[in-house]
Amino acid sequence: MLSSKLFCVLFFCLGLSNGWPQFDFMNQMGFGGGFNNGPHPNSRPGSRPNSPLGDIFGNINGMVKGITDQIGKIAQGLDVNNDLGKMAHGPPPPQSEWVEHARRFCRRFPGHPKCRGQLPQFNDIGSMLNGILVDSGKWLPKVPFINIRDPLSGINSDLKNALNGIQVQFGQISQQFANNIRNICQQMNCKQQQQKNVQMKQAILKQTVDFEKKVFGNNVADKMNLRFDRTLQLKQALLEKAQLKGVVAPEDNGVFDKDLLLTETQANFMLNELGKGGEGAIPMPGSAKAKRASIFFEQNLIQKWPSTSPIPYTFDSSLDNLDQNDVRGAISEIEQKTCIRFKYFASPPKGNHINYQKVNSPSFCGLSYIGRVEPANPVYLSFQCGNGRGIAVHETMHALGVNHQHLRMDRDKHIKVDWSNINPQQYDAFVVADSKLYTTYGVKYAYDSIMHYNAYTGAVNIAKPTMIPLVNQQANIGLLGQRAKMSNADVEILNKMYCKSAGCDDKNVYCGAWALQDLCNNPNHNVWMRSNCRKSCNFC
């Protein structure tokens, strides 16, 4: 097994090839509490005169190839694309080995032109892999159709009009903003996939496959690859919606919005919102019949943890005592400020639970799913970004069902996104979340939310912010991305999600938006709001 030290060195080295490994990622994410959320230094660490770090980095860089080869061997067999990519740089393999890889590729991409009627040959390897990063969706199994309920169907026209300027069509940006992104791509290569993205996805894949095989006895390599493929397909669809298809290839790192893992159901829902329902080669088993969906938290309790019993959690053996203390501190903060309770298990229990795992990687600070997922919620933490407790709070809140603050449907009323300075390949980190998926519950926007990203997230010019507060800019820009503690707004939203009595709920995802416009007690809507928006309006 690859040692934790080897993992650490591997990801550190990969970061070096793209600038400043720690400042570039952690500070922009807002997770590196030690960097004060300010502009980046204007010299790369280790390049200063007489700095011993320069020699150290040089020696580490010399180790990259050998380490990369090692992790490739360890992850071999989990991702056929990765295997084929390595195979393309060597001599033809034995025919039996090639046939196995070709079959796996065609099972994963049944619509690929080289998989129609016969298996591809080794000399087809270039065309097999070409285009996957730009438009892989048409070769994957079909995205199932989902009949998504319109939450505004039958709603009073005044309430509909109240959403003008707030309700944003998922993935839509102005032509001017799209042109800003195109201009960036004239100055940088927006289609090249960085090696750190490939390695990050392989590390997550291996960690997940090992966990589910160990705990549940399941081999989930194919399932995880489809999740990653759907995540990439979603990123591609968002770029297409912004008329950036063919201009930008998104980061193929297995995650969405920098630290979110998506289930296939979540990805399929958003793909349907982007008009991709039915796209693909052949129907997925059992997907011929269109499904009715409403993923809004109040109406889809599969994503919510039961409030009647403590949430089970456990630690992977990869966490040392200090790491465990950080997570316990995070859990303690949530318990002290809300009604939510957790229960520790020394070994993974049967059924749903949160499993905290350590991945020694400065390529990310933490990763999590949103809401409860089957069969368990892995939370991946690197403990290399400063303030491990605050990062654990952030990722645990994702597991509880909370999305990022800066992606709220009303975010453009509170921050300005500088589209002329964002990394185009990280476009998904700036797209306002699907308004049918998440509600604000009437909680005001909070610059100091522990769920907000840093002001310099995804910046091309890392001396300039990508997110600028529209209120009291000088004071609030330093609050963005703080990981010191939960804000009052973070506490309020968890209490509304989990700590209200039975029957205290919202019946419409836009209740929170209406509540923030003081429509709860409006004489024209009071009766309807009392019946349908009890939680967001604080009527219970």
Swiss-Prot record:
The prosthetic group or cofactor this protein requires is:
Zn(2+)
Q: Which domain of life is it from?
A: Eukaryota
Q: What keyword terms does UniProt attach to this protein? A: Disulfide bond, Hydrolase, Metal-binding, Metalloprotease, Protease, Zinc, Zymogen
- Positions of the ShKT domain: 504-540
Q: Which residues form the Peptidase M12A domain?
A: 293-500
A GO molecular-function descriptor: zinc ion binding
The record ties this protein, via SUPFAM superfamilies, to: Metalloproteases ('zincins'), catalytic domain
Q: What InterPro entries does the entry give?
A: Astacin-like_dom, MetalloPept_cat_dom_sf, Peptidase_M12A, Peptidase_M12A_astacin-9/10/11, Peptidase_Metallo, ShKT_dom
Q: Which residues form the active site?
A: 395
Q: Does the keyword Zinc apply?
A: yes
Check the record and name the Gene3D superfamilies matching this protein. Answer: Collagenase (Catalytic Domain), ShTK domain-like
Q: Name one Pfam family in it.
A: Astacin
List the CDD domains hit by this protein, alphabetically.
ZnMc_astacin_like (cd04280)
Q: Which GO biological process categories is it annotated with?
A: proteolysis
The protein, known as? Zinc metalloproteinase nas-10
Organism expressing this protein natively: Caenorhabditis elegans
The encoding gene: nas-10
